[in-house]
Amino acid sequence: MLKQRFFYFCLFILMSYFVTAQELRCNISVSSQKIQGTNRELFTNMQRDMYEFLNNKRWSENIFQYDERIECSIQITLDEQIGSDQFRGSMQVRVSRPVYNSSYSTVLLNFRDNDIDYIYREFEPLEYSETGQNSNLVNLLAFYANIILGIDYDSFSLMGGNDFFNRAETIVARCQNAKESGWKSFENRRNRYWLINNLQDRSYASVRECIYKYHRLGLDVMSDNLTDGRLAILEALGLLQKAHRIKPNSYLMQVFFDAKADEIVHIFKPAFTDERKRIFNIVSEVNPANSSKYNALIQEKTN
């Protein structure tokens, strides 16, 4: 009887660990329609292995309850298969977080990576080592796991994502000799190297400050005080002008507005005219690519 009670106690502790240990609730999809003549079960197993790697691994020392896990998705579109086990394509990474005291979920990151190139061998486990060598697939998934965590933590506390961004930067540094693209500065200005470079660059610290103030002091306040929350978002976006005027046309700025342009218009469209003009002047300066969307902010309201 005593042994049985001890067994159930150990089982309870073990189950509690697995319920609370993992940080991500990441939906994975692998689209392989462009690849012909391949065993489709291979891609089912590939998707399952990626899902288990991201969702079952513990990425930090922090404890998450089941309903606190970070909502995210990774959509992989494979364009070609080289040989039996090498694949190339693109990846869309999307991260969202709940807004306090509401049913609304806000997008933190909506990022497209066009430099996806990895080897996947069926039935070979995906294992990550912080000190040893990893496959490019494992490095890709670990890099984005840390980016996802870092962005989420930044939205709840000022510079809260530092540890995760440091780990992502370490992964990039270790991949400088990789034959696969996306890791190096000279390949193009919009890849993994420049994403983490911008996040770690002190010149863009005001962008990360904006992420915190926009979400924690702005969106999270709006259910209790709409005016104060909207004003905090206005002031947060004003910080982006500081970064833009120091180093214009940054990749990080584009990544921010890819996630936020539509939401900003939705938040400020009901505001008073002077407030709408202020926000229009900010966002049209720092994000001219979405100027057609922002024009809705200065259109006169009709009854």
Placement of each model-derived feature along the sequence:
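Bacterial Sec-dependent N-terminal signal peptides
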Residues: M1-L24
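Start-of-domain marker
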Residues: Q22-R88, V99-N101
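A cross-kingdom marker for long, charged
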Residues: S29, I211-Y212, R216-N303
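Second-shell loop/turn segments in exported
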Residues: Q33-R40, E127-S135, R245-I246
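Sec-exported extracytoplasmic/periplasmic mature domains
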Residues: Y51-W59, G150-Y153, V265, K269
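Acidic/His-rich structured neighborhood in mature extracellular/periplasmic domains
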Residues: D85-N197
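Flexible, glycine-rich surface segments
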Residues: G160-M253
